[in-house]
Every structure is written in structure tokens, then in C-alpha cells.
Amino acid sequence: MKNARQGKRQQEIDLNTRKRTKSIEIDYNSITLNNFERLINNNKKNRNYMEIKVSSSQFNYTYGNRIHLPYSIALLVSYIKTKEKFSQFRFEKTFVFRNEEKIEGYVEQCRDSDILLCSCYVWNWEITTLLAKKIREVNPKCLIVFGGPQVPEILEDFFEKYPFVDILVHGEGEIIFENILSEYLKERNYLKIKGISTKDFTTEPQERIKDFDSMPSPYLTNTVLDLVDNVDGYQWIASWETNRGCPYQCTFCDWGSSTATTMRKWSEERLYKEIEWFGDNKIPYIDGCDANFGIYRDRDFQIAKKLREEKLTKGFPETFMVNWAKVSSEKIIPLAKELTSVGLLKAVTLSLQSLDKNTLDTIKRANLKFNTFSNLTTSFRDENIPTYTELIMGLPGETLESFKKGLETILSDEDLGSILIFNCGLLPNAPMNYPEYREKHKIKSIRTPIFLIHTRKDEISIQEYERIVIETSSYNLKQLKEMYRYAWMIQTFHTFGILELIAKFYQNEYKLPQMEFYETLLQYGRNEKSFFSKEFDFLEKHVDKGYSGKGWAHYDFDLAEINLPLEEASAARFLRLDTNILFTEIEKFVEFLENKKEFHSKSEILSDLIKFQIFLLTTREHLEEIKEEKFVYDWKDYFVNNSAITKSKVKYFYKNKITEKDPIKWIWDVVWYGRKEIKYKMYPKLLQVDSLVINKIVHKLY
């Protein structure tokens, strides 16, 4: 029977008569490394049979000199190792480094493996299937098991395309893997096991794990380190869950659908010990895997407090990357302050995805009201905590006009930090990918090389792919390309600050909507030869290449040896310009705008404004510790207090955010590491003022 999930499920499984193997009763919450090792050694003493060799893979990309530990595999292994009945299973090192040259070595190591366990994600599917295929060729008897988010629930022709895979694991893998190994030791009738698919059948889903404290920690048992070899020059990233589940059902995401709405938590005692483990083992980066950190406000505050204490005591962890609760409020500010006070947190995410009501209804998402959102960004700004928001282009229900309207609304929030805008990815198990949903909204997608920002080109020898949406009933491909152009302009010229205050000036003085300002910039970039137009040429090629399925990678080795998003690369090219050249380029565009809109601003005002805009940017030319500049007009008063333009010979100064002398490191610090922390510009309200002449004269534009 093929893909029984799409038809009737197996009904003949009699759960009442199912045989269960008795195992040792253990208090996993009190497990330490020493008694875990004693337990394993005791299990080994009971062996009087041949070992079963288990190999595994959880491939990841490197980010700088960092790579993720194989957390998912370690969860399974640490659990299995506590079961006496599985003492004959010998777990080999997990393959994590992705390199085509290493594949043959991995295959050779698996020539005599009995089981291959593969943790599958969108960023490692191709290399994982290549590994499994090659191992099947040299080791036909190996049981190959795939699990992870990339394992599809809707199988279609999966086993025809990947005949070398024996078992697919759906959902949480701990209990399912235990049952697979139990059956492996017996008659190997996998039909008895819930939550799996083979080429012949799919069984009913496995119930969710209710008691997480029955699962030992892969960190406290040191399992996660036992599964890897340390490599000189590399540091480990630790994935970390404090809870599992998501109460939301956004259709573009597989989080809520894959873990259901029930939220389940690990004990605070275990989490605090894991935080201490991170510090003891000098783990620099914690990749938080919660869908909604902060949803348990008091509990999560104590977790944040413990992380802060650990960093102050031991210097590690250095960074905690976390997905914040979708419906945030000022109540999470104390959590964020604990983390930002010691540099653990770079910025708080306040995601919107879309501001269009019809789109939000279509994707089953509810946002904060925008005035509430805006008040929240102001509260964070008052506490000196950076914020950023995320938008998705091309969601079902969105139109070009609604997308532009949403951007106009977001730009009205002057306290919001960065704006990050992404294509709409189509995940295999997200509700958006269900056949009935795709048909209802006329969703078309393409397979394209995966866009993994800040990864090295030399890791792309085995190309990974993703699916992105390129058309729905609410927009066509041409309109989506236009959305991308506006997304790039807003991120490059507004968020990175190249033209931000110029746009606000024209909005204040001429009531020119900011999106109309950027529409004019688009016309200028398309028709006028300038340094700006060179970036627009990059943009057009990038858009055509991306939406034809050839990928979104953008490499400029004058900037960095990594894949930069186009908006980061464009901003970097502007910010490293000689400031006189940048002044001239902005001046040319302003002249074009004035002529196009028939504005007649005074040249002295415009020159001083452009000078002020550039002064606020983190430019490569100026690496001094303190930046200072004299101006004819009081621009701080104008932008911060909405005052009239007044002449006042004034000098502003501020501490330079980036003074790195190495040109490549400078770019990384400004547009990569510094993007969410707003390291690329200074806000007018934070300027220090040294008044030379307190003689203000209200100055008219005309």
C-alpha cells in the first residue's frame, strides 16, 4: 500500500496486544555525567552478543568559524543509551561537516554500518540523500532511517525517487526511534511502529511526548560532544530548547503543524544545568529553538537571568539567538534587558510578516495592532534595546499595492530598527503546501538553489535547494519582482540609512509619501547613469536570476568571502565609498527628485541635509573614535522634535560604532554582525550637541 496517509491508515495494529519491553526505571532529571557513564558501562558489561554499528549524519553549514552541534541526533542517542536493552548498539561519530571531498570517507566509514540515521533539513537534503545513496551501493543491508523537518508527510512518489531509504520518521523522533530499534532486535516487523512510512505502508501518528523529563539531556550527558571530533579553528553552536510546541497555526510555517498547539516544557532545574554546561564548555553561540521565547514570562525571565549570570561569571555563552513570542508586549522588556545588558542578545524580533488584513486572514495569523506595535518599539528604544521586524514577500492574499502600503506603514515607525524582508518559502510540511491550500490560492512555486546567507562559496559543491512561491491568485510573477525591487530599496536605502533622512525631509516639507519617494528613486536608478544605477543593474540581474530558479547567491570578494544578501552588499558598497563621492551621488538623485516633483528647495539646505545624512552613517572613510561635524542648520531639533528648519551653527558628535581597520572585518561588523544591532548608522536623537552660536533663525524653504 502506497502512502496510506493519503488514504485509510492501517487499522489492523492492535495496541492492546502490542508487546512492550521492560526497561530500567531512571530519574533522568537527576542524571549527571558521572552516573550516566556508569549506567552505560553497566550496560556494556551485560553484553554477550555482537555489537550493532549505528552511523548518523546531521550536516550543517559553517558561519564564519562556527558550526552547529548535532543536537537532534544527540537527543536520540542520549535517550537510547540509557536503555539496557539497547546496550549492543554502538553509535559512531555524527557527520556534520559538509564537504564533497569528505563524502567518500563518510561512505567508507559506513561500509559495515548496520543502521544509518539521517537528520534532514532543507539545508542538508541533497548531501544527505547523496550520502545515503552511496552507502546503499556499498552496504545493501544497512537500514537507512530518515527523520527531521524535511521528511515529507505527503509522500507522493518519494520511495520511487529515493529507493535507498528504508524508513521515514514523522514528527518527534525519540519514542519512534526507540521502537524502531526494539523491532530491529526482534522480527523487524515495522508495521507495528507508529509514526513511520516505508515503501509499503504509513502507520498512524505517534503520540506527542508529554514528559520531557523522561528524556536525558544530550548536553549534561556529554553525548553531543561524544558524537563529534573537535576541529582546530572551529567553535560549536548549540541548539537549545526550553519548550516545544507552538500555539499558532501560520500556514507558511511547519512549526505549529509539526508540533501541534500543545506547549510542553523542560524543567527549570535541567535548563539551569544546561546553561552551566554551556559556560563550562565555552559554547559561544546558543541557537534558541523555541518558537515563542517569552511566552512564559516569569519562567523565561529566570532563564534569561541565569544566562546573564553565567556569562558574567564565565564569559560564555556569548550570544543567545532566540525567536520571541509572536504576540509580544512590554512585559518581555525585562527579559530582553537581562540579555542585552551583557551582550547576549543583539536585538528583539517583532515580526509582522504582512500588514494586510486579507493576507493575514489567508495565512491564519494575527498581528498586534500597528499602533500597539509602534508603541512597543518606542518602549524598547527608550531602554536602548534594538528591534527589528520581518516581512514575507509573496504571501497568498498579498498584492503589489498592499505590500507597498504595508511598507509605507512600517516606515512611519521611526523607532523600529532593521527591516528584514524575505521570499515566501514553501516548506514540505507547512499547511501552505497542502494540495487543497495550494489549489484554493492558485499557488505556483519554483525549485531554486537555497539561499543561506553568510555561508562560504566553497561549501556549495553539493547544491541544496528550496521551494519559493512565485505566483498566487492575488499577484503574478511580474508583480512579485516589483515587490522585490521595493523590498531591496527599503532595506538598502532606508534601513541602512543611505537616504532615510532625505526621504523624511521630503515627507515633512512636501507631504511626499515615502513610498513615492522610493518610486522616484526606482525611476532614477533605471534611467540615470550613476553609482546608484550600477546597484540597480545588479538588482535587475539578481531578480531575473532568482525568479528563474538559478538562486539568490551574491558574492563580491572585494567585500567578503561569504554570501551576502544583495541589500547588505549594496549597503556595504555605498558605505565604503569616499564620502565626497557618496555626497555627489545623493546630490544627483536629489536634483532629479526636485525636478521630477517640481520642488524648489534651497541648495544650501539640501547640501547641509545631505552632509548630515552622511555624517550619521558608519562609513569606511571615518574610523576615528569620535565623529564630529559642524552644520549650518539644527537637524537634530528638526528630526527629533519636528521643529521648523532653523539656522544654528552647531556641532554634533558621537562615538563611532565601528572602528575596525581591517576592511573585510569592518564590512562583517557593519552589515552582518551589526545589522540587527544597528551598527551602520546613528540616530539623530542620540547625537551630542556642542552649540557654537546659539542664534536660531527660522529658515524658510523657498
Task: List the model feature ranges, each with a label.
Residues 115-117, 279-289, 315, 319-323, ...:
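Conserved C-terminal portion of the radical SAM core fold
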Residues 80, 134-135, 307, 380, ...:
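Hydrophobic positions in alpha-helices of CheY-like receiver
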Residues 89-209:
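Glycine-rich beta-alpha loop elements in corrinoid/cobalamin-binding modules
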Residues 75-89:
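Short helix-loop-beta junction
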Residues 5, 18, 23, 28-53, ...:
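N-terminal [4Fe-4S]-dependent radical SAM core
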Residues 42, 218-382, 393:
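Radical SAM [4Fe-4S] cluster-binding motif and immediate context
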Residues 62-74:
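Glycine- and acidic-residue-enriched helix-capping/strand-helix junction motifs
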Residues 2-59, 64, 86-88, 109, ...:
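Radical SAM enzyme core and accessory elements
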